[in-house]
């Protein structure tokens, strides 16, 4: 049994969120509707405390709970990103949810529950812990997707996500059972030992199903079909959350399981990851070109970006993992900044989502147009912004691993994808002005400015960031 001081030292963020959820449920049950506003503030406070415990807490590595949970530099890095994504999504959505009269006290609780599942998922070192974390994350997401019950599109989005999510969970569970049957253990290190020097066809089949289940959570091709409809139909703060935190958790556990459990069959899983990466980059680049709704465009953009991130994982090296970590951190900043701008798209108190509504924004809301243009240039990978260095990291790792065709395809897809990002900049700066947007709330303006500055300054002062990704990647090997 793990001693209590060790548990407190290495699983404190999870304990804070778990205890906080119970406390918030109790407050909500007692105070009812009167607790709607304070609940969000309390949830933000809990997420902030969890971030501080990770940043300021112990830096040693420990395995807890009979080998099913690990606290290492890799996990801490990804957990900080997930918590930041959840915290900013909650902050950005508070005014929107109140305006739409859906600011129920259950919303921040569901965000916290989903985030707790993500933290468990990132630290999982066994198939059972992986499945428990994944389901805790997913069950809350199903409800959040359909949180706007009076909106038909939101209800449709929630139903689609639930049905396809249940299918993907079944595939993952079937893959886990195959792996357990052929390896004789559910622990990642035990699986690696069982596969040492031997390749079992049954394990490879299990890995395919396991990867399919995780690919659904990452919204990569061919398990992406839910993404555009859910992103468009769900409330915009929910879409911002979907586009950030769950993807980080899913790609984190994918990296952990491939590097630690299946290192012995790297050529086999490398082919799977390369296949998913190429399809995701291609679809994300080409399918977004014809989109007119900016939330659907961001859905295809996220599919493409996950494909680019998987280029680093396909390399299967420490440099590749470092590239993925850097890519996901930069992707998080760009995504949150873009959704802060999307949430600010309101005309006479009504939300608008069409790209044409951004016409002439530079003349009506110049500062908003400037920072949104920075996000678009960075998402397109234009140097010297952070998005360029994100892609450079993963393509460099692919070249070092002699995956030249993958790197070339990635560069070509990035070039094609730049078109629809630059089209938004063109609409904002060169088209005749559409009706002016309402003044953004101070919170959304602050998020847009901070993320914009981060994208600009990351290329100037990369030292601490690169060092953090290096330490995190090294701890996985």
UniProtKB/Swiss-Prot annotation:
Catalytic activity from the UniProt record: a quinone + NADH + 5 H(+)(in) = a quinol + NAD(+) + 4 H(+)(out)
Alphabetical keyword list: Cell inner membrane, Cell membrane, Membrane, NAD, Quinone, Translocase, Transmembrane, Transmembrane helix, Transport, Ubiquinone
Subcellular compartments: Cell inner membrane
One Pfam family, short name: Proton_antipo_M
GO biological process, one term: ATP synthesis coupled electron transport
Record's function text: NDH-1 shuttles electrons from NADH, via FMN and iron-sulfur (Fe-S) centers, to quinones in the respiratory chain. The immediate electron acceptor for the enzyme in this species is believed to be ubiquinone. Couples the redox reaction to proton translocation (for every two electrons transferred, four hydrogen ions are translocated across the cytoplasmic membrane), and thus conserves the redox energy in a proton gradient.
UniProt xrefs under PANTHER family: NADH DEHYDROGENASE
Subunit and interaction comment: NDH-1 is composed of 14 different subunits. Subunits NuoA, H, J, K, L, M, N constitute the membrane sector of the complex.
Protein name: NADH-quinone oxidoreductase subunit N
Classification of source organism: Bacteria, Pseudomonadati, Pseudomonadota, Alphaproteobacteria, Hyphomicrobiales
Gene name of the encoded protein: nuoN
